[in-house]
Amino acid sequence: MFVDRAEVFVKSGSGGNGSVSFRREKYVPRGGPDGGDGGKGGDVILVVDPEITTLLDFSYKKKYVAEKGENGSGSKCFGKNGENLYIKVPLGTVIRDVDTNKIMADLSHIGDKYIVAKGGKGGRGNVRFTTAVRQAPDFAEPGMPGEERYISLELKILADVGLLGFPNVGKSTLLSVVTKAAPKIANYHFTTLSPNLGVVNIPGIQSFVIADIPGIIEGAAEGVGLGIDFLRHIERTRLLIHIVDISGLEGRDPFGDFIKINEELKKYDVKLWDRPQIIAANKADMLYDDSIFQDFKKKVENLGYNKVFKISAATRQGVEELMKEAAAMLTNIPVTDMHISEEDKFIPEEKRFTYEIEKQGNVYVVKGSFVDRLLASINVNDANELRYFHKVLQNKGVMKQLIDMGIKDGDVVRLNDFEFDYIL
């Protein structure tokens, strides 16, 4: 089954906690601190695997969590870092952050990888807090939490040439003739329900990848039929081969079909409409009057399309010449990566411990991630740790902000469940 969209939850590992530990050594206060740092949490990393061609696996597994970092221990032993979690995705996968809908990465080259969730930093052990005055710190830092988010994966197939046209004009037949691909072929509309890829290998020309893009009909840009689901797969192609049924056996007007498909391209993305096209008038073996082809050719040439071929995919008439022209045109069309504008680009938030102060009468409530982390690392009932606590508040600017807010002697400062009286 071809699946080209998925949404999953990813979470990196939290950092391990720093250790509170003391070595046993004579004449060293409390044995001397020797608590090691916690290990870093594992990252969640998406990596391209060229052997994968669909996002089907993500239909069954929706949650990916990396390993936590191990806690530090005595003798200054650092905790082991958590293992990174590698998730394989197909070539051409676009990653978006679900909350912002911003593009995180476009994995369009073999070897590409992207960290979608960075592991938390390990907490510092108590040996890190030793000073000339504080020789036996009885506290350590907890590990930083890992990142978590929902991401959407969108597969936009990578092909040099896209086969374009209404259903049942012979796109799949042409693909099967010029490549080793084996798409489903039958004489009814929408036989092909997913893009098919193949490599064109013809002696004397540079090989290239070609894709049969199904489901494009009038109204596709608004989602009619299979519509937008497959229009986006054309975005990466450098050249389009626009196939029409020149035989008219189904009562269709080839020129009218040509105009309608191009209108859909223009409505979806004007850059697609402006992409180079070769026109392939297919089913010429069933054409009863060559003047029909000549009239069609004249009309499209008047619109500026001068690469028009009369072919029959079924009998292979004109097919090799068509492929040679495509290969020749590709040599002059550069390969360009997907452009991500600054507006669409995802910028990860910097991990910062912040706080805010709210005045409630004579009580000043300090809250935020900074407060949570600080209180998690110390014992406020210990005099030495309490001195460290006040020093951190001073260095962080909390005390200055309290003064600027007009705190008075005897007012209360509250941090979560801990509070103290402010003394000038």
Curated annotation (Swiss-Prot):
Pfam families: DUF1967, GTP1_OBG, MMR_HSR1. InterPro entries: G_OBG, GTP-bd, GTP-bd_Obg/CgtA, GTP-bd_prot_GTP1/OBG_C_sf, GTP1-OBG_CS, GTP1_OBG_dom, GTP1_OBG_dom_sf, OBG_GTPase. Signal peptide: none annotated. Residues 159-331 form the OBG-type G domain. One of its GO terms (cellular component) is cytoplasm. Mg(2+) binds at S172, T192. Residues 345-424 form the OCT domain. Keywords: Cytoplasm, GTP-binding, Hydrolase, Magnesium, Metal-binding, Nucleotide-binding. PROSITE patterns: G_OBG (PS51710), GTP1_OBG (PS00905), OBG (PS51883), OCT (PS51881). One of its GO terms (molecular function) is GTPase activity. It is found in: Cytoplasm. It comes from the Bacteria. Its main location: cytoplasm. The keyword Repressor does not apply. Residues 21-42 are annotated as: Disordered. Its cofactor is Mg(2+). Residues 32-42 have a biased composition (Gly residues). Residues 1-158 form the Obg domain. Belongs to the TRAFAC class OBG-HflX-like GTPase superfamily. OBG GTPase family. Monomer. An essential GTPase which binds GTP, GDP and possibly (p)ppGpp with moderate affinity, with high nucleotide exchange rates and a fairly low GTP hydrolysis rate. Plays a role in control of the cell cycle, stress response, ribosome biogenesis and in those bacteria that undergo differentiation, in morphogenesis control. HAMAP family: GTPase_Obg. This is GTPase Obg.
